[in-house]
A protein has these predicted regions:
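Active-site-proximal alpha-helical segments within enzyme catalytic domains
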Residues: 15-19, 125-160
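Mid-domain, small-residue-enriched loop/turn segments at the edges of structured enzyme/sensor domains
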Residues: 84-143
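A short, well-structured edge-of-sheet supersecondary motif
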Residues: 1-6
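Short alpha-helical scaffolding segments that buttress acidic/His motifs in well-ordered protein cores
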Residues: 70-75, 86, 99-100, 138, ...
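Active-site SXXK
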Residues: 11-39, 74
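Conserved catalytic neighborhood of penicillin-recognizing serine enzymes
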Residues: 46-84
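Short, well-structured active-site flanking segments
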Residues: 26-46, 93, 148-153
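Short, Gly/Ser/Thr-enriched beta-strand-loop segments that form substrate-interacting elements
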Residues: 167-182
């Protein structure tokens, strides 16, 4: 892997949702939780002052939803409420940070949730990564069987289905190019 401008710490912004999804899927594997298991997200967990297509679809109520759909909302649509739900599910943002670092990915740091970043936008700089660290995690996912084949394929599809950033990363690429991202 060749890295350019890798000495800087770049705020991950919503890219950290990828790391959260990897951590959540790994916890699901460890606890034998199927993707289609239903859970209940309480209305009070659906914060109003943040980007949340799920909350907009089901306003002023809790919702029964599968882990599969929570991860899709988080990765493919960039929903902040489902992101924070996954952070709570894995045991906190520090669990995401320590799990990714346990894989040998060191040049990154996660200390903030979507909720905390919305209270103070400057906190987004506390969640950072080098470009190489993200590339290393992607490579490990492809080469080291970190996730089961089912979970890897699911996450890959969620990334390919990502609706955000169409005017940035993939703008101008031929339409037959497959480009997965978060």
């Amino acid at each position: 892997i060749i890295a350019i401008a890798n000495e800087d710490k770049y705020p991950t912004m919503s890219v950290f949702k990828f790391h959260i999804a990897v951590t959540a899927l790994k916890k699901m594997e460890a606890e034998n939780i199927p993707l289609d298991k239903m859970v209940y997200i309480k209305q009070k967990e659906m914060l109003k002052n943040t980007y949340s297509p799920l909350r907009d679809k089901y306003p002023d109520q809790g919702i029964r939803i599968s882990y599969r759909d929570i991860i899709k909302y988080t990765v493919s649509i960039s929903d902040n409420n489902t992101c924070d739900w996954l952070i709570r599910f894995v045991g906190g943002i520090d669990k995401v940070d320590s799990y990714i670092k346990s894989l040998g990915i060191k040049d990154m740091n996660f200390t903030e949730t979507e909720e905390s970043m919305h209270t103070d936008i400057m906190l987004c700089y506390n969640n950072w990564s080098t470009p190489l660290a993200i590339a290393q995690l992607l490579k490990k996912l492809h080469t080291e069987n970190i996730l089961t084949k089912e979970h890897f394929a699911f996450l890959e599809t969620a990334m390919l289905d990502c609706v955000s950033g169409k005017n940035k990363l993939i703008a101008g690429l031929p339409t037959d190019i497959k480009f997965g991202h978060k």
